[in-house]
Every structure is written in C-alpha cells, then in structure tokens.
C-alpha cells in the first residue's frame, strides 16, 4: 500500500520539507478524516504544513480532510525540561484529543515530584471535572511519551485555594482569552503582504456580511459528521432558534440552533459588549450563515456544542424553477390536512410564487380550513389561489346486484370464492376456485378445483390459505379450468363476498383467453350492510358469526363459498320478510336506505371555478361533515352532482376511483363509464406509489408507468385533459422526516417508507414523465395545468366587508335608552361632561354601524339580570359610557364623581387627584342632605373604539356558568334558527406534544440525536392540525338577509356526531371581522354572587365598593378575626377571585394597596405579560415610580402620553402597539423623548408583551370586592358558596382528619417545589381555605345519605354539610342518581341503593368508608337477626 511506502521512507523528499518525518497517522472513519503527526528538529511553519497536506492529498484523494500536527524532535530530554521548555508542544498535542483546553493548561501549576511523576494543579472546578471525565491524566501521560519518548505518571489535582469557577465565569474568562489571541494574531497579520492576507482587518471592516470575527474561506463540514474530536471546524446552515442568556455581570451569551439538514447543533457565542446588541439583532431565526468555531463538550448541555469564533452571513442559493413556461400544482396539502400535511399554506404559496408559478391549488383532505391563510398569502405574494379540496368520494350509485334486471330470489345463483397468489389480477394467479349453485332457495350443485399457477406460491399466501405448492402442482391450469367454470355458471347470477376482487380475476382471465363473460353480479358485503346495519365490520367470519353460520377452514375457496352461500340463503329469507322478492326491488330499497358511512371511499379532487362553485363547495363540505361523517367527511357522488355547478372534478391519486379501476384492469366500456363523472384525470410520479410494489399490488416501476400511460390514453381517447401533479404533503424532500415522525406516532408501520411528496419544479416534473414522450409530458405537466388555472376565476373565500346583523330601529333605540338612563341618574339637564361624552360616543357608535351590537348585548344582559344572574363585563367595553347607560356594563368610564340619587346634584373630580369614584370619601348632598352616590373610574372611550371610532368593538360578557347555555339558546330567539353558530377553533399539535412524538420516534429508532436536532424536528411537527373545537363562549351571528355559506362551511366540534352543537368550519379569527362575534362566556363570579344573594338576601349591587373592613383584607387578615401568623398568610384574600393566587398575594404584600384604584392597578399588573415581573416591580423597587404612577393598564399609556402633550392619535397608536407586545418604533421613541417622557417609562413600554384594559380590571375588582364583603360579614355563606362553585379538588379524607392533617398536607405540597402538579395546586388552594375556615370557627359536617345535596355544600346550624359528590370516588352523576332515588323513599339496603340509586360497588364502598351507610343491611332479604 502507498501508505506503507510513506511510512517505510518517512522523510519527505522536497527540499522545503527536509528533516521532517512522519511520526504517527490517525484515521477517523466517521468523518473520513486523516490526522498526520510529524516531527522535526526545527519548528515547522505554516507553509511546510500546507506542503505536507498536498503530498498526502496527492496520494490519497479520497480523504475528506487531512490535518497535520507537528512536534519538536528532541533527544536526551527529561520530564522537567518538557514542563519548562516544551510545554506548549504538549498542549498543542493534547488539543488533538481535548480541543478546548489550551489556555487552561497553559495557566496550570506544574511540578515534577520525582523523575517520572508530574503534578498538575488547576483551580477551575468546571474545567477540572470535564478533563477528569476525558481521562486527562492518561492522555497527558501518553502524549508525553508519544512526543518525547519519556514515560511518566500524571497526577491532576483541583487547586481549591483559587476558589471555584462557575460555568458563566469560565466562559467569560475564555472569551477574554480569545479576544486577547485575536488581538495578538491581528498584530502578526499586519506584517503579511495584503495579497496573502485573507483576514486583513481593512477587508474585514469592508465586508458587511461578517457578523463576528473574520471571513471564513474553508469548506464547511456536514453537521452530522461532527464529533468530540472535530476541533476547530466550519459549518454552514440555517439558524432556527435563538436564546439570550444574561450573566450576573450583565454580559450576554448568545445561544442558537443551526441546521444544515444533515443534523443540527447548538452554537454559543460571547460577543464583545460593544457589539452585543448588533450581534443579537443580526443572529435571528432564518439567518443563513457560515460559522467557524471550536467543538467542545458542554457539561451543562451534556453534549458537544460549537463555541463560535467567526460568523459570516451568506446569501443562500435556493432551488428555482427556471423553465420558460411553468407548471401549476393542482394537488397540494397544507398543515390543515390532519396529521398529514407538514407545511403552512403560506410557506407553500410563497415557494410557488418565488418560482414564478402563476397559480397554485390548495386541496386538503376533506377540509378547507387553510383558505383564510391562503387568501392572505395570495395578497402578499401576488399569486392566484385555486381553492379546492381532496374529498372522500362514495359512489352511492353502485347497486347490490349489477345487471340483474328483474331476476327473482328463486333464480339461479352461483356463489363462489377464489384463492390467489396475491392481490393483482394482472400479476397474480388463481390457485383455487370453489362454488355452490343455489336455485329456489336450495344448494343444487357444487364446484371445486385447485389451479396450477405455474409459479411458486408466496409464503404469506401459504400461511393464509394452507395451500402448498405440492397441492397445486398437478392441478389443471387456468386455461383448462376457466371454460369448465363458465359452463358451471351458465347464465346464473354470480355471487361473492367482496365481488369486485373475485370477479376481477375471472374477468381478466376470460379476457386473456377470449371467453365471453357478462353475468349479473351480486356482492354480499353491501347486501349484509343493507340487512344488518348493526354490525361494525363485514368480513366473512364476522357476518357468519352474527348469523350463526359455521365457517370451517376460513380462506379456503370451497369452505368460504359454502359459508357465503349460507349467508345468501339467510339474507334471502330476511329479504322476503321485507317483501323484497326480486333484485330490482332490492336495488331500489338499497338506494333509498343506503348508509354511505359503511361504503368504501375514493379520493377525489374538487376545484372551485367561480363564486357559485365556492358556495356550493362550502355546502358540500358542510353536508359531508354534518350528515355523512364516519371517520372521514364523506361525499356521496349524488351530493357532488347536486352541488356541481361552478366546480371542477379531478380523479385524484392512486386512492381515486379511476386509478383503482385501471389497476383492476376494467374494460374500456367500464372505464369510460367511470371517467364520465370527472372533468380531468390526474397522474403522479411513480415513486409516490412505490408502496404498491412493496405490497405486491404491482410488479415493478414499469407497471406503475403503464398505469399512468393508460390513464393518459384514457383521457385522450375521451377528449379529457390529464394533468401531472405532485400530491404535495411537504415543501422540500428534507421535510419528509416530519411526516415520518407523525405517522410513526400514529402507528403506521410503513412510516419510514415516505413517498417523495414534495413540491417539484417544472423541469423535475417533465423529467419524471418523459416516458410518456416529450409532447405528452409537456401537455400533462404544463399545458393542461396552466389551462385549468386560467379557466378558474380569481375569487376570495371570505368577503372583505363586514356584515353585522340588522335590527330595525336599533340606532334610535340605543340612543333613546342611553339618554333616558343618563337623565335618570344625572337629571333632566345633563352635566356638560356627561352630555359631551355621550354625544361623542353615540355619534361614533351609530355612524360606524355598531348600534346593533350594543342593542344585542343589552338584550342578553337584560335577559340574564331578569332571570336573577348578574353579568360581568370583560375587555375594554367598560370604557364606553353608552355601554354603562344601556346596562351592558356596571363600569362607569366618567371621571370620579358624586351624584345625588334624589335631586341629581353632581360633582366631578377632574384634577386627577382621585382615580376611582369608589375612593371618594362619603359625602352628603349639599341640597337635600342624603348620602351621595359615588361612581366613575376615569376611562377614556377611545380605548374601546379609537379616536376615529373605527376600531372594531369587542363586547365580552361574563355570564354565570350555570346560565351560559340559556343565553346561548336565547341568541337563536333573537336572530333565528340557522343564523347563530358557535365560533369554531382548530386544534394543532402543540410544541410539547410534538416533542413527545419526536422523543418517541428517536427512542423507537434508537437514534443518537443532539438537542438542537430534537428542537428542529419538534418545530417541524408543531402546528399540524389535529382536531377541531369551539370557543368557550364565542357565537357567530349571520344577518337575516345572508347565509353562513357566504362566509364559511359548518361542522360539529371535533367531528362529534353525538353533539347538537354546530360550529364554523373556519377558525373564528378568520371571519370575526366579517360576522358579528358575541362573547358569551361562562364565569364563576356571577354564579357565586347569585348563590350568596340567595343565601343571605343581600343584593350584591348595593354592596359598597370601599368598605374599610373589606379593603383591609388586601393588606391583612385581621378583619377575618385571625392573624397572619396562624393563617400563614399576610393578607386575607384566600378564595377571592383575581386576588387569591400566591402570585397576586405576594403583589399585595409588596404594594400594600389602600384604595379601590390600587386594586384596579394590581389587577392590570397581574394579568399583563411582562408588565409586573422585571418591569413595574423593578421600577417601583428602585424608586423610579410608584404603584399609582407605573404602567398598569393599557389606558394608562394613552392617558399619560396625552398629558405629556403627544398628539392623541399617536398616543393611541403607541398604546395599541405596546399592549400587543409590538414595542416601540424608533419614530415613536423619538417623539416620546421630545415630549420629556422619562427613559424608564420608554424601557417599560418596550418590555410589555400584553396589557389588560382598565375597564376589564375595574369589572373584575368590583366582583372581587363584592365577594370579599360576604367573606367578611357572611362567612358561613361565603365558604359554603366557595366550595360549592369552585372547589373541584375538595379532599374530604384530609379535611375530616383534622387541622393537623390539613397543615401537614399543605406543607407536603409546598415542599414539592417545581414538581407540583395542577391537581396539587388546586388541592393546596382548597386546604388553605379550609384552614382559614377552621380558624374562624366554622366546621364541616360529614356527608349524609339523606341530608347532603348532590353537589352543593349546605349551611346547617352546626356547620357546613359537604355534598355526596365531595366524597372521593363518588362522582357528581352518581350523587345525582342517589338524590333522585331517595326522593322516592329511604333505601332499605345496599342492594336497594345499587338498584334504585344506580350506585356501583365502588360508590357504595366509598359511601360506607365515609360513614354514610351505618345500619344499612347488605340485602333486601330480612332475617331473624334483623328483626
């Protein structure tokens, strides 16, 4: 070998390499890398190393990379000399094995203890542990021996005197050393001539593509080939996730994931402080870049990462469609094809547009839920969308008996079965035929024979049938058998179970041998579906068992034919019972009562040609979901024909009817009949159907091509266009892995064998179909697809306009209600501030067409209040005074004010000294002496509708949870049946779920995958549709003069056939700007207040909002008669809505609120995202602001900026951007600074991700304060109500063990820390309130079989009686059954409880354990001992 020759003569011959010899060679198989170690008495320079590389590359061209390391060749050296003079050589050698430790080893303390022992001390515990893990002592000892021939022992010791160094400190130290080296290297580089200096500093500065470090010239390696030995390498790829970590010293570490689609890896970067913000800005998701860095083991991540030195932004060269005339894709799936399509509609449309395609179709499986996204993408990328669907076609026009005419049940029938070598009538052979002849209801003849297939029978067929080769080797061949079998049949009706399969073999063989065959055919599968609909499956053995017919030796033709004959005879008896006496009557009755849910489905492509077609498709989608859903939304052929106008029907893929019929080798006449339903036929790349080869359905690729050719010719012969499509399920070939993972997760055994269902260019498709001939391929790929695209109108699946419902006279009614209510409060002459506000609001509301929304909300609230349930408003509707005057909300947006309920005297506080009327001191009317009412929370109307009144209003209302269904039903009364639909939602795979799919896949495949690649795979699987649902309270309203199909199809949530709820097919967000959406939400607070009112007789509306005792609860529990120490809580807000959580309780402790307006601010702060933590909390703590002046609700921003003299419209725009988490533009930041807005305020705005409206916060606090009032003054009613409505995690067992058990359980849950579950959290809340209740002297009473309610906690003289459902293991339904049964009389035994009360054995045991069944005998039977 050449390598051996080099080693034999290991001194290089070139003069420039004189004295250099090869010391050792290492080959790394995984990365195909050669490492050459040379020795020389002189120092080997870079030019010589380059020459050595050339020598090896010349001789060994097949290595991907050759690395050369040089050592000094010295003799007569000892260990001390090595440590003092040649340590750097050792360090450089160690880098071969441990690439990241250079500077650390240089800075270590070295001491030679005796002649052959080296003691090495190092003070960085982080790196020390890594080096120990790497077996550093052995590597160092071996390296010294290899390089210098000196044997020694190494003792590596942690020097604790230097203190410990954590990971981040170590990284900062490393980064400082790197910077130092870069500076050092740059000084050296200045001496090199410019033309040889690839990293010249001036060139670097000019290169704007450099993000960090220097330019990178070497070729990148595949990320999949990187391992711990890789050292310093270059990679190239797409950044897909970033994370910024801030150290204690304020330095920032940039961590990001990068992929080249061979794998992915984590990259870490420590930018210079001056460059940090720029680097963070440039390293974003989607960046395509080249990186050079060192591969190191990260002990925190427990895997290798790259410590980046250089990062260069690159222009990505992407695949383009360069054909002069481009194709159009007419079969494409998005993420809305449930668990099947991998890419978003936008990404697919963006690619098609980028390639210059004039149009692209969207054809998801059975749904059209990608349309809204596609519509927006079409506008964005200026491309036509062809809206379509791949439906599930049911051919409901196929009779049970074909060509049977008026044949009677007494006629002659031949029931037969065949066994074959496989599934293909073209490639497989018959090996057995069995038949029985039936006439006048009796078996009159039999036929049975083996058939020699002239080939070996496959093993799986032998296993299935028991027919071996020796059994058929002497049997007659099919050409001998078939004429005899045809003679046996005569003109009988041919019968089989799944006749399509068996008859196809007979037809094919008759055709091959020129035998005429045209007998009537009856299939017993649809016959049994018609007669026995109660069955779920209709396999022969299942039907036989159901009818009590024996089936011996299943999968033998003779036995199967006999059993099928018996089934036919039983079916004939049942048909006669139905007075069906002939096959024509049978077909007629079958078509009348056909259950298409049990019929086979075919794929079909339906494209929308125009607006009429769009509406028809929406109707078709709706009916398929509402009336014909069984596993899939099925579309009967008759239904498609009913809505066919404006639609174009295509034959779809290999699962389509046309492909299947061609595969079955049907006659031309039969095929002509089948294709008459379609407008165009479809062919696809043969590799899409490779599974058919694997499964033995077709023989090879050539047969797949033949099928496509037949479909093409069939279309041409019938003057029908044929198109070539990709059947796109993912964007690029690399994306197939996501589909593999999801399919594997669903249990598909063939998930690994992914067909290439990616989007192809025109040239790729032309090459794919070149076997058709150049002209035909061009026609199918380009001409016909473009013609179809051109024949389709540009349409919008959702109209742009808004279509609010119309109520005659709504404008006048709203105005009248408003003014009348205002006069009733403020008097005949309205205060100017009220009059101006109402006039402005009414004009804005009426002029923009929103009066009807107000009127509807008023009617819904009025209905609830009349029925005794308060309604809480949500969102910013509390900003609208008109909403207050029309009784939609209790929140009054006027400035704080007094008003006399008698003489209407009023006084408004407009100087900003008070934020809420509730905080005003009590005051008597100066005119009539009565106590003045206090109101007003100072909320600008513009928060709701904007300064132009053009912001879409959103009125959210909190109804009692137990009353919500009544209100939903009432909307139908208001708008009419068929005009009200629940707001639909689409449930997609969340990242957490996707992560589970990925981890399962990796585990099952036993793959070793880095975290970055797991993250990439997780992101790729996220967002794929899984199911559908409904908004908890959203109702979409269609105007009387319109219909839902102009906006969306409709369906049931989660395709649940058992529910009466109908939802929009589109996610409600897609159409909420077009149709009115009412938010009729269920909430506990109104339910709680109703129950408290029922128990106490106190009207919640009359409760003062600033009662001193009540307000004190938010800073101390003293008003409850307990102290903070015994309660283990510094405030008294356990169980109060919005203020009972641990997080908000701590906020109360931190802020010490003393007013209603303080509570409003706390509510706003606690509900926002990044509003309190690391924001207002910090600025208050550091003294920049106070609770009263920080940013708490969205309204604060606009109000404050207007006070700072910013133009109102700009103030509103800034508020809207900030509240949605969009930060501030440079222009907005500049104008804020110009108006002296403080820096902390600007920074606070930039941190906010989401903000609560003040109107919402006020409404919540009003409810909380009212409930708190009952907690203080009516404690028993409060606790009974709380546990009845909110305590789903009540633990009766712990509660009745006593106070000590409760406190122990509280401590146990608190000790769980981050491991606490949601159930634990719920239980903790319940136990804390139980503890508080005990401290207040109120106790629980055990459940009683006759005294307890099913689900409500009842007040008794001695305490609160728990309900039956509060006992563990006794659910609410079981409790209700018992309560209903006891109304009929007491239970006489456990047996009676079981029968009348429907109590299961488990329920009875749990009731007994709780002590509810004392004295109740086991049985109804009396004995002497019972007397």
Curated annotation (Swiss-Prot):
One of its GO terms (cellular component) is cytoplasm. It holds the Pfam family DNA_pol3_finger. Gene3D superfamilies: 1.10.150.870, 3.30.1900.20, Metal-dependent hydrolases, Nucleic acid-binding proteins, PolC, middle finger domain, Ribonuclease H-like superfamily/Ribonuclease H. SMART domains: EXOIII, POLIIIAc. The keyword Nucleotidyltransferase applies. Disulfide bonds: none annotated. It catalyses: DNA(n) + a 2'-deoxyribonucleoside 5'-triphosphate = DNA(n+1) + diphosphate. Keywords: Cytoplasm, DNA replication, DNA-directed DNA polymerase, Exonuclease, Hydrolase, Nuclease, Nucleotidyltransferase, Transferase. Its main location: cytoplasm. HAMAP family: DNApol_PolC. This is DNA polymerase III PolC-type. It comes from Clostridium tetani (strain Massachusetts / E88). The gene is polC.
